[in-house]
Amino acid sequence: MTKGIFISFEGPDGAGKTTVLEAILPQLKKLVAKEVITTREPGGVAIAESIRDLILDVNHTNMDDKTELLLYIAARRQHLVERILPELKKGNLVLVDRFIDSSVAYQGYGRGLDADAVTWLNNFATDGLQPDLTLYFDVDSQIGLTRIEKNKEREVNRLDLEQLDMHRRVRSGYLKLAQENPDRIVTIDAARPLEEVITDALFIIKQRCLEK
């Protein structure tokens, strides 16, 4: 069975990862013989998108932290079996906007839940699947929140309402994950001009995944 390439895009809110993903897509399609599939978490398929709406609804500020975690994991499982795995089996290049690292950073470090438990639950839901490459877009938490506030086209969600300290804990979690997984996670300084970040992201993908 042909195996595709699985790349995740990670980063705190306001890092610009989604913008970079969209920007490099046309160039990647020219470089790859198979299809290039883009998707997101939570979401990507109908059931997971419905769960996304529940999680991010600004009216659900009383959501319990463990409830939030389990909803993310449920969405991830459905997305995996319905979208990610079928595309990888076809040998396609799959780019996903957030994956397991988001849960560990946000629910583990950000919410203060047991990071090992968060990791175990996610591994259970994904049968241990890990991306071949993870691009982590790093930016100071205050800069990220300022970008969100200035982006009038972006819809505000429940996580945007969190205090700065929460976002700093999330960033700290991401940095620790990057330190612990140097073979998989490549850190990109996302505080630089967007064009530089886009250039770096495309170069890393070509070097690590497309030129072997």
Swiss-Prot record:
Naturally occurring in which organism (per UniProt): Streptococcus mutans serotype c (strain ATCC 700610 / UA159)
Record carries keyword Kinase: yes
Function statement: Phosphorylation of dTMP to form dTDP in both de novo and salvage pathways of dTTP synthesis.
TM regions (residue ranges): none
Nucleotidyltransferase found in the keyword field: no
Protein name (record): Thymidylate kinase
Catalytic reactions of this protein: dTMP + ATP = dTDP + ADP
Keywords from the named record: ATP-binding, Kinase, Nucleotide biosynthesis, Nucleotide-binding, Transferase
Lineage: Bacteria, Bacillati, Bacillota, Bacilli, Lactobacillales
Enzyme's top EC category: transferase
GO biological process, alphabetically ordered: dTDP biosynthetic process; dTTP biosynthetic process; dUDP biosynthetic process
Top-rank taxon: Bacteria
EC number(s) given by UniProt: 2.7.4.9
Encoding gene (name): tmk
GO CC terms, sorted: cytosol
UniProt similarity note: Belongs to the thymidylate kinase family.
Family annotation (InterPro entries): P-loop_NTPase, Thymidylate_kin-like_dom, Thymidylate_kin_CS, Thymidylate_kinase
NCBIfam families: DTMP_kinase
